[in-house]
Amino acid sequence: MQISINELNFDDDSYQYMELLKQLTYIDPSIITNEMFEKQLSIIKNNPFHKIIVAKIDGKIVGSTTVLIEPKFIHNLSSVGHIEDVVVDQNYRLHGIGKLLIVKAIDICRQERCYKIILDCSDKVCGFYCKLGFTPKEKQMALYLNGK
């Protein structure tokens, strides 16, 4: 099984990508047109501190994560990396795809001189992230502005 890890691009299947995201959280691909998707992807790709990484097998998107870089004044003008929206298609889990995505995200954060990386996860996947060097820290807080 050949797995490729790359940034999400305009020639990737937008519907396939959104269907994958449905396994992570709420999204309704039926209301997002190709034009809307491309506009949003253009906004993301024009931001050098925002990267969507996808894993593909035979051209099919089977995993994804988002990396955000937050430039800081503290720690001698370094940055903080944020890993978000980690998802692997349920039919492809336990094949090392999640690990490949996180390793790529960590590499991006290193290249951007991040002094730490933050990610939020549920208790059931803490062990996975601990094996990759992450440690539980503090508590996460959230305020949902749209009620979801």
Curated annotation (Swiss-Prot):
Protein's UniProt keywords contain Kinase: no
UniProt-annotated binding residues for acetyl-CoA: V86, V87, V88, L94, H95, G96, I97, G98, K99, Y129, C130, K131
Transferase as UniProt keyword: yes
Pfam short name (any one): Acetyltransf_1
N-acetyltransferase domain: residues covered: 3-148
Binding annotation for substrate: T25, K72, F73, I74, H75, E84, D85, V86, Y115, K116, D120, E138
Annotated GO biological process: UDP-N-acetylglucosamine biosynthetic process
Pathway: Nucleotide-sugar biosynthesis; UDP-N-acetyl-alpha-D-glucosamine biosynthesis; N-acetyl-alpha-D-glucosamine 1-phosphate from alpha-D-glucosamine 6-phosphate (route I): step 1/2
Family of the protein in this entry: Belongs to the acetyltransferase family. GNA1 subfamily.
Reactions catalysed, as given in the entry: D-glucosamine 6-phosphate + acetyl-CoA = N-acetyl-D-glucosamine 6-phosphate + CoA + H(+)
Name of this chain's protein: Probable glucosamine 6-phosphate N-acetyltransferase
The EC number(s) this enzyme carries: 2.3.1.4
Protein keywords: Acyltransferase, Transferase
Molecular function in Gene Ontology: glucosamine 6-phosphate N-acetyltransferase activity
Source species, domain of life: Viruses
Taxon lineage: Viruses, Varidnaviria, Bamfordvirae, Nucleocytoviricota, Megaviricetes
